[in-house]
Amino acid sequence: TDFVDNYYQKVLAAVDENTGDVDKNLPDPVFSAKYMNMHYMDSANMTGVELDGFREYDTHGSFHNGWLYKGSSGGSMKFTLTCSVLEMVFKAQNSDKYGAADIYVDGEKVKSVDSNMSDGWDNPVTAYLIDDAESAEHTVEIRMEPGDAQAYFVMAFGYCD
């Protein structure tokens, strides 16, 4: 009880002194119709996905129909989709066993998405892969380069027409 008493008498008083003035006004909400009518895709409803080193996998308690890459020889998953927006949901973990994927859209590398994150705890994270004003047909490739043993979990995709 001495610890708790000390906390309430000393620590909370110090916190009150160090907080300063806090602006309690919230910013105006931002609304965009751009992401309305987003569609969900996973291995249960996506067709035409070329898998090389990836395999269908129950990736997470809330995402049962994803894909897993596990190995060191490299691999990819590739598909074609008509969309204006594409998001990838992947699993983050604070572990060197989780790797980074290079994302290619229409043959050009657009980003690398690392699933080894200091704040990862097997949680889903979203990465924007395409964010265009107009819908168009795109070829998307998620590529794992050869190297150290690594794992990468793609849980699902979201897209807007």
Regions found by a protein language model. Give the residues of each.
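Glycan-recognition surfaces in beta-rich domains, encompassing non-catalytic CBMs
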Residues: 3-161
